[in-house]
């Protein structure tokens, strides 16, 4: 732990896992399903994962996703709270209702860890915009800012993140 608290996020930040590992940012992984088989969004840990995913798309098999459930968050947060306070920046509520499950899990764990602080923030962001917000929070953490200072910064900046999207292939949209 680089500071007095743990900064965590979800795999939808569009950054490689190695980056999160280097920055000491624990990640909760989403999954996707194709033909009834579930695959973890592994953020580049498995060199076969991206070719497999794009192979599905090329074969006309569109993946489906599901929100993270309360149990997944509770398990993730429980492990982190054993080590310290947690500031979790969640994937934006405009794309998923998962953040509501994160808030429910946080509430459930408050009784188990009354001495710990667990803050869950709806990033209001997705994709690389989400990644930029988490990256900025990690920079502030590494500069020695407090959990409360970073929370205030994220709450202020999350509405100012400008998202752009482009694709070279339109057949999937």
Predicted feature locations:
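Mixed-charge interfacial surface used for oligomerization/domain docking
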Residues: 2-4, 12-20, 25-33, 37, ...
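Short, charged beta->alpha transition segments
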Residues: 69-79, 104-106
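Short glycine-rich or small-residue beta-strand-to-loop segments that form or flank ligand, phosphate
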Residues: 85-93, 119-122, 136
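Ligand-binding "clamshell"
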Residues: 64, 113-119
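Glycine-rich phosphate/diphosphate-binding loops that line cofactor/substrate pockets in enzymes
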Residues: 1, 74-86
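N-terminal glycine-rich anion-binding loop in soluble enzyme alpha/beta folds
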Residues: 6-72
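N-terminal glycine-rich "phosphate-gripper" loop used for MgATP/nucleotide binding
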Residues: 66-73, 91-97
